[in-house]
Curated annotation (Swiss-Prot):
One of its GO terms (molecular function) is phosphopentomutase activity. Belongs to the phosphopentomutase family. The gene is deoB. It comes from Streptococcus pyogenes serotype M6 (strain ATCC BAA-946 / MGAS10394). This is Phosphopentomutase. One of its GO terms (cellular component) is cytosol. The keyword Metal-binding applies. Keywords: Cytoplasm, Isomerase, Manganese, Metal-binding. It is found in: Cytoplasm.
Length: 403
């Protein structure tokens, strides 16, 4: 019998809590990640008021230096710890896959200087369209269409760009390049990026509409991902008949593997929280696992090195946390964590190699305190033990610590 009938895992994308022990092996603009500290530096430079996460125990997580504006709680309502990544990567897919029980020993390839001519030329030859070379670099998805959409409308050239993650994205105005054509181009791009030196996690079709100065991305986005190389706990749950619900980009990250119910992409963190709450309210969701990713922290503020915006985004989530809890049942478990860091005060624009926080809450708790410090995959091991399925490759369950 399950200790908790439902477990809800919410990933606050990039909300790290201090440099990992191996941060010296990871870099931003030539600077090692050794001094990165997403929550610490936001708290220090912009101030941080997250009283609802404080109640659960966020300020009680062990740190060399306490979070400046996040107090400790004498009698928290939950259990907390921080977790270390063992996989050789600090990207979204690697973090999420490890959280679900896999050790990624060979990271995907990322292209901080843009894609090589060999890849671009192949796409041009296949599509019969030129590629705008100036867009070929890590770029905000909205900024890239603002900057190059007018040129695309005039020439029909492709907007090919990347990000901090191992992805190749192609943006196309739906009136200039039909969605079906864009999909075929992305399918081809997927076929040529399945092995090194260009092993990419996802190819993403990014259609948009509108006029210069007023472009809008449409719901016709399509992801061409690779599936995890081995079963994750999501697969073990699905195979055992335990429903799994994906909110946000979770379904894309796992290429649908082990997902029984995809609740759709998020338009924003707030929309994602709305979707999570609707998921919690589903009458048929009496037992199972929900997995939510809230990406605005990372996409809108971490990469853009905007600590004040990041702070406000954390405030927004914290303000809505009581709504999530109010829609949980007595025997539900809420786990709040991250997938990597992205210190908005740090050098460069890439993710940062950090510990991630873990907050555990249930209305059924009679105790509180610290969970032993462990690794990302401890989450998957805990979920697996709760539902009585086999664990994946790695991880130690902390289920027994939750009283």
């Amino acid at each position: 019998m399950s200790k908790f009938n439902r477990i809800h895992l919410v990933v606050l994308d990039s909300v790290g809590i201090g440099a990992a022990p191996d941060a010296d092996k990871f870099f931003n603009a030539g600077v090692a990640d050794t001094d990165s500290d997403t929550l610490g530096h936001i708290s220090e430079t912009a101030g941080l008021s997250v009283p609802n996460m404080v109640k659960i125990g966020l300020g009680n997580i062990s740190r060399p230096i306490p979070l400046k504006t996040v107090p400790t709680e004498d009698n928290p309502t939950g259990y907390v710890t921080k977790l270390e990544e063992v996989s050789l990567g600090k990207d979204t897919m690697t973090g999420h896959w490890e959280i679900m029980g896999l050790n990624i020993t060979e990271p995907f390839d990322t292209f901080w200087n843009g894609f090589p001519e060999e890849i671009l030329t192949k796409i041009e030859e296949f599509s019969g369209r030129k590629i705008i070379r100036e867009a070929n670099k890590p770029y905000s998805g909205t900024a890239v269409i603002d900057d190059f959409g007018p040129h695309q409308m005039e020439t029909g050239e492709l907007i090919v760009y990347t990000s901090a993650d191992p992805v190749l994205q192609i943006a196309a105005h739906e009136d200039i390049i039909l969605v079906e054509e864009l999909y075929k181009i992305c399918e081809y791009a997927r076929s040529i990026t399945l092995e090194r030196p260009a092993l990419l996690g996802r190819i993403i079709a990014r259609p948009y509409v509108g006029e210069p100065g007023n472009f809008t991305r449409t719901a016709n986005r399509h992801d061409y991902a690779v599936s995890p190389f081995q079963d994750t706990v999501l697969n073990k749950l699905a195979d055992a008949g335990v429903p799994t619900y994906a909110v946000g980009k979770i379904n894309d990250i796992f290429n649908g593997s082990g997902i029984t119910n995809d609740m759709g992409h998020n338009k924003s963190n707030s929309h994602g929280i709305d979707t999570l709450i609707k998921t919690l309210q589903l009458p048929e969701f009496t037992k199972g696992f929900s997995f939510t990713n809230l990406v605005d922290f990372d996409a809108n503020f971490g990469h853009r090195r905007d600590p004040e915006g990041y702070r406000d985004c954390l405030h927004e989530f914290d303000n809505r946390l009581p709504e999530i809890i109010a829609n949980m049942k007595e025997d539900d478990l809420l786990l709040i964590t991250a997938d990597h860091g992205n210190d908005p005060t740090y050098a460069g624009t890439d993710h940062t190699r950090e510990y991630i926080p873990l907050l555990a809450y249930s209305a059924s708790f009679t105790g509180n305190g610290l969970i032993p410090q462990g690794h990302f995959a401890d989450i998957s091991a805990t979920v697996a033990e709760n539902f009585g399925v086999d664990t994946a490759m790695i991880g130690e369950s902390f289920l027994g610590h939750l009283k």
